[in-house]
């Protein structure tokens, strides 16, 4: 089954910083979907937006009044087969990439993969869940030539 990935760019800062942001997002989302051929559903919407918009979503839906890098909103079962929506905040993502010394393109692809995995039911609340999700992220990102995003985290443990 083909799953549509619709990408909406609300904040042009994304394409100013990464001219091929839309293609990067699509490739990362598609890599996750390709690794899960048994998915039931029709579509995912990914919104590249600003910090204020993500803060409003986080406040309204999670009761947390701050911007975060990525939010995932799995859809309840629906006749359209929508899997869910993802929103990414440019300012937070760009700041994190700079602080972590990695290209924004790599961080963007990591967060898209992370968000899509959440839509598919993966979580990281417990250590065993986090390890499984991170392992899958590493595998997917390696296929996109994105270095292990958790490598520096583990060196510090």
From Swiss-Prot:
InterPro entries per record: MetalPrtase_cat_dom_sf_prd (IPR023091), YbeY (IPR002036), YbeY_CS (IPR020549)
Enzyme class name: hydrolase
Entry superkingdom: Bacteria
Cofactor detail note: Binds 1 zinc ion.
UniProt keyword annotation of Nuclease present: yes
Subcellular location: Cytoplasm
EC number: 3.1.-.-
A Pfam family annotated for this UniProt entry: YbeY
UniProtKB keywords: Cytoplasm, Endonuclease, Hydrolase, Metal-binding, Nuclease, Ribosome biogenesis, rRNA processing, Zinc
GO BP annotations, alphabetical order: rRNA processing
Transmembrane spans: none
Cofactor: Zn(2+)
A GO MF term: RNA endonuclease activity
Binding residue positions for Zn(2+): 114, 118, 124
UniProt similarity note: Belongs to the endoribonuclease YbeY family.
NCBIfam families per UniProt: rRNA maturation RNase YbeY
Physiological role: Single strand-specific metallo-endoribonuclease involved in late-stage 70S ribosome quality control and in maturation of the 3' terminus of the 16S rRNA.
Protein name (record): Endoribonuclease YbeY
Source species of the chain: Caulobacter vibrioides (strain NA1000 / CB15N)
Lineage: Bacteria, Pseudomonadati, Pseudomonadota, Alphaproteobacteria, Caulobacterales
């Amino acid at each position: 089954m083909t799953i549509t990935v619709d990408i909406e760019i609300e904040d042009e800062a994304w394409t100013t910083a990464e001219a091929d942001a839309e293609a990067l997002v699509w490739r990362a989302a598609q890599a996750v979907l390709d690794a899960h051929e048994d998915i039931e559903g029709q579509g995912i919407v990914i919104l590249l937006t600003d910090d204020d918009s993500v803060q409003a979503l986080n406040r309204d839906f999670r009761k947390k009044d701050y911007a975060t890098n990525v939010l995932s909103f799995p859809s309840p079962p629906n006749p359209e087969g929508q899997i869910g929506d993802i929103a990414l905040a440019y300012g937070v993502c760009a700041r994190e990439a700079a602080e972590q010394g990695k290209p924004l393109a790599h961080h963007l692809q990591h967060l898209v993969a992370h968000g899509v995995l959440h839509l598919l039911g993966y979580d990281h609340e417990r250590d065993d869940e986090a390890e499984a999700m991170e392992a899958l992220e590493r595998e997917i990102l390696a296929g996109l030539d994105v270095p292990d995003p958790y490598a520096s985290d583990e060196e510090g443990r």
